[in-house]
Amino acid sequence: MSSNRRHIPLVLAAACSVAGALALAPTAQAVAPLTATATYNCGAWGSGLATLTAADSGTSKTIKITSTAITMPAGTSADPNSITTTLKLTKTSGGVTSQVQFSGKTNPGMSGGSPITLGPLKLTSGTLAAGDSTNSVVLPVPPSATNWSLQIVASSPTSATVPCVATSNQSAPFVW
């Protein structure tokens, strides 16, 4: 048997192993666009444009929120991973509208005047299938404990519950 023929079983085994691993690996799902902007009113924390960044790994759907217009008030601070954030979005699926929520406790350390960075927040309420779209839950001002689209609950060292309302739809809805 020639040297090349002896390697054929090894090459076939390696190719089958790679194909099997690829077949079992979770695939990244597309969400478009990856970023969108919307305006939020967060009372004492400020009002203005926020950037929402979406991701779909195939096993987890997330949204990260950043804003230079919405900031921690002077004299306050937050330790890393001490802010619980919940974001409500309107979901449209096959012409039917409902709500989903993204929530998490992921943030860098922040102090008074710092722009907010919240998340990534994981999908925690509702489901999203391929082709579903999500957009801001636009509500009237002022935000309150029962009237909010985005809720920020800081716990350390400053304790505060900050309800926010979206005052605009996203620049483009996310299509999952």
Go through the PLM ranges and name each one.
Residues 1-30:
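Secretory targeting and sorting signals
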Residues 31-176:
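Primarily mature extracellular domains of secreted and cell-surface proteins
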